[in-house]
């Protein structure tokens, strides 16, 4: 392929560069170090090392530029810094993301008016809040006996800790006040506790937020068999004789299209673009794009009572500082929402000029609700209309059921109760964010125990009836969840990557054995 920056053939082609795609690269680098790997990302590299969280960029102007560069076809549109700033009827994306231009709602449906995506190396992990709670109760996938070990592996890859904000002023106080109204009757694992976060501290005590760079790790970056190609749009997965055979990729710099052969293909985009690519490739299992689910989100704010300024250091470009803390109210089947309680540096609503805010005393509360899963909730594709990348246009069909509305009503009452327990509410009533605001879209390439038409892939994430093709990302999660899905999605990616590594290693051993027999 003269003039191409891409290899003619690799062992594994990975589409996407978010946490799950990066988990495949990491596990393969660790467990199949001889395998050649090519990773393709449609967006540009916006941080250093590639995939790093933009919050780690200290210069505000450079950070803003990285966010704009991640917004793909939506670059230049007006954004909002927090989901709670989106008022009813307004469609604005958060920095680093962009919204669907059309097809996000249809008459008689709720739709997903603020469904968003990112196009950059690292995907949304360059912009996320880094919350990594473990699933509980019916959030857990019942047919994976090794799920707990896989979650441990995901913790390792993401660099998860519950100690990032140890010693933050008022964080103990917030948890104590929440626990007083939450913990009764709950098992220890489901009581109020610090939020597990993918973040660590430098030697100078500064915060470093995990992005895909942390998931990849040095073992991937130093792997001579691994290559990352940015500004590269994969337009088709190639299938020969029913088996994955490679990808067709368009170089966004030159416009030229190239074929890269591969023994395995991993499609690790988001829950909207992964099924889009499979559809465009003619790979269309019955469940593809179906069981789409978002987490309805309710937000509220309170102010801590009886606290004084402790004069800590200011924030460095994020909503969290040394005065901050993040408390977690875990999901339970009895209370089917996940609580994320963050101490903020500023009030989300105006306060009196003579009433200065004590840093860390403003508490933002959010409850995420598990969806009532429906087969009819789906992202469909229109072959007659193309999106900004020339791919089949997305058409989202999505409704909140009666049960969803009942859970939302419960969540609204609960968040007010929690807000009053913490302090003085800053607003009269909670605000329900528009569908899509959670950014936690799942189910569109869902995993299943058997090929029964209700799932897209096996417990190893291999697409049914297409050997060698694997899917990754939040879309693989088959259960209704309220907790942040990244940890679970990375755990599932670890399982799939190990399946590929095992097969590659087995094939290598067989080849070496055959060579010895010939000699």
From Swiss-Prot:
Cofactor annotation comment: Binds 1 FAD per subunit.
Key words of the record: FAD, Flavoprotein, Oxidoreductase
Keyword Flavoprotein: yes
Positions that bind FAD: 41, 118, 120, 124, 129, 131, 234, 474, 486
Keyword Aminoacyl-tRNA synthetase tagged: no
Enzyme nomenclature, EC number: 1.1.3.50
Annotated SUPFAM superfamilies: FAD-linked reductases, C-terminal domain (SSF54373), FAD/NAD(P)-binding domain (SSF51905)
Top EC class, one word: oxidoreductase
Composition bias type Basic and acidic residues, residue spans: 55-64
GO molecular function: flavin adenine dinucleotide binding; oxidoreductase activity, acting on CH-OH group of donors
Coiled coil: none
Catalytic activity: isovitexin + O2 = 3''-dehydroisovitexin + H2O2; isoorientin + O2 = 3''-dehydroisoorientin + H2O2; mangiferin + O2 = 3'-dehydromangiferin + H2O2
Required co-factors: FAD
Active-site residues annotated for this sequence: 440
InterPro entries: FAD/NAD-bd_sf, GMC_OxRdtase_N, GMC_OxRtase_C, P2Ox-like
Region (Disordered) residue spans: 43-93
Chain's role: FAD-dependent C-glycoside-metabolizing enzyme that participates in the degradation of certain C-glycosides by catalyzing the oxidation of the hydroxyl group at the C3 position of the sugar moiety. Shows oxidase activity toward various C-glycosides such as isovitexin, isoorientin and mangiferin but cannot use carminic acid, puerarin, orientin or aloesin. Shows weak activity (100 to 1000-fold lower) with O-glycosides. Probably plays a crucial role in the metabolism of C-glycosides in nature.
Family note: Belongs to the GMC oxidoreductase family.
Quaternary structure annotation from Swiss-Prot or TrEMBL: Monomer.
Protein name (database record): C-glycoside 3-oxidase
Organism per entry: Arthrobacter globiformis (strain ATCC 8010 / DSM 20124 / JCM 1332 / NBRC 12137 / NCIMB 8907 / NRRL B-2979 / 168)
């Amino acid at each position: 392929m003269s003039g191409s920056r891409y290899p003619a053939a690799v062992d594994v082609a990975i589409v996407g560069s978010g946490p799950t795609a990066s988990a495949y690269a990491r596990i393969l680098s660790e467990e199949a170090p001889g395998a050649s790997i090519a990773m393709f990302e449609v967006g540009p590299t916006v941080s250093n090392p590639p995939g790093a969280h933009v919050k780690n960029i200290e210069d505000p102007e450079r950070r803003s530029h990285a966010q704009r560069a991640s917004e793909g076809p939506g670059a230049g549109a007006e954004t909002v810094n927090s989901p709670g700033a989106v008022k009813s009827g307004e469609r604005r994306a958060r920095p680093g993301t962009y919204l669907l231009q059309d097809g996000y709602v249809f008459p008689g449906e709720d739709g997903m008016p603020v469904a968003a995506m990112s196009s950059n190396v690292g995907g949304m992990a360059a912009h996320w809040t880094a919350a990594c709670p473990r699933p509980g109760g019916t959030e857990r996938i019942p047919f994976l006996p090794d799920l707990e070990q896989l979650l441990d592996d995901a913790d390792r890859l993401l660099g998860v800790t519950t100690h990032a904000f140890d010693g933050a002023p008022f964080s103990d106080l917030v948890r104590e006040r929440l626990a007083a109204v939450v913990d009764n009757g709950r098992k220890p694992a489901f009581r109020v506790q610090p939020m597990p976060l993918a973040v660590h501290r430098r030697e100078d005590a500064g915060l470093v937020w995990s992005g895909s760079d942390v998931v990849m790790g040095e073992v991937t970056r130093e792997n001579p068999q691994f290559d990352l190609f940015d500004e590269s749009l994969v337009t088709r997965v190639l299938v020969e004789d029913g088996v994955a055979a490679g990808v067709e990729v368009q170089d966004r710099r030159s416009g030229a299209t190239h074929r890269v052969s591969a023994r395995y293909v991993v499609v690790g985009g988001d829950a909207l673009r992964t099924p889009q690519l499979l559809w465009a490739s003619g790979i269309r299992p019955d469940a593809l794009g179906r069981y789409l689910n978002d987490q309805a989100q309710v937000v509220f704010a309170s102010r801590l009572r009886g606290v004084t300024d402790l004069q800590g250091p200011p924030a460095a470009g994020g909503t969290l500082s040394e005065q901050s803390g993040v408390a977690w109210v875990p999901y339970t089947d009895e209370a089917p929402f996940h609580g994320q309680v963050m101490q903020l540096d500023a009030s989300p609503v105006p306060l009196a000029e003579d009433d200065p805010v004590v840093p860390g005393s403003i508490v933002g509360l959010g409850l995420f609700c598990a969806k009532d899963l429906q087969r009819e909730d789906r992202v469909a594709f229109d072959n007659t209309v193309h999106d900004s990348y020339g791919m089949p246009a997305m058409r989202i069909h999505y409704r909140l059921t009666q049960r969803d509305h009942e859970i939302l009503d419960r969540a609204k009452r609960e968040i007010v109760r929690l807000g009053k327990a913490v302090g003085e509410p800053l607003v009269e009533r909670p605000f329900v964010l528009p569908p899509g605001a959670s950014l936690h879209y799942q189910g569109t390439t869902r995993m299943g125990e058997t090929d029964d038409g209700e799932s897209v892939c096996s417990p190893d994430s291999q697409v049914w009836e297409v050997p060698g093709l694997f899917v990754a990302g939040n879309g693989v999660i088959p259960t209704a969840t309220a907790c942040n899905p990244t940890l679970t999605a990375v755990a599932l990616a670890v399982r799939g990557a190990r399946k590929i590594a095992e097969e590659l290693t087995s094939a290598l051993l067989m080849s070496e054995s055959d060579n010895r027999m010939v000699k």
